[in-house]
Amino acid sequence: EEVRLERGEPDYMADVQWHFIGHLQTNKLKMVLPYVSLVQSVDSVRLLDAINAWGSANAKVINVLLEPHIAAEETKQGFDPEEVARVMKDAIDGKYRFIRFQGIMGMATFTDDESVIREDFRRLRAVFDEARRSSPLFTDDFSEFSIGMSDDYRIAIEYGSTMVRLGSMIFGERNY
């Protein structure tokens, strides 16, 4: 909710592709989905079903990244890695006609211990690779591996990250 899209944007904004990152509440879909090119943080079947229903009602296919939960913190959202395989099977069976699965987004445990971060990224990579292997449907579109943030992006790149999130590096630390 930090970014408000307003009517009458300057012409240079026409080519901007907005990604939504963070926990998306189902009651906020109508405020977000019309404006974004990718939802990077689909963290539950409930949210996936709601996005698919919104896409059906609005005749729009929504691009998403699935967010598996592999970090040590219980406060982080996400699918169990085994749930990702079930979602992929449901997609193959045609359940999600208004969703284009484009990859995986994940976060490592918030720690200074590089070995923990590496293990988290290794596990995320395994989930990503298994999802890609699960069906030929996903080999082309399912190509985004969004891991890494300002503190660990260099390690993420070693593990094949295709997108990194550098908000703190660019804008500074948040003050809550």
Located regions from the model:
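Conserved alpha/beta-domain cores
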Residues: 1-151, 159, 171
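Active-site-proximal glycine-rich helix-loop-beta segment
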Residues: 160-162, 167
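Short, charged, intrinsically disordered terminal tails
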Residues: 173-176
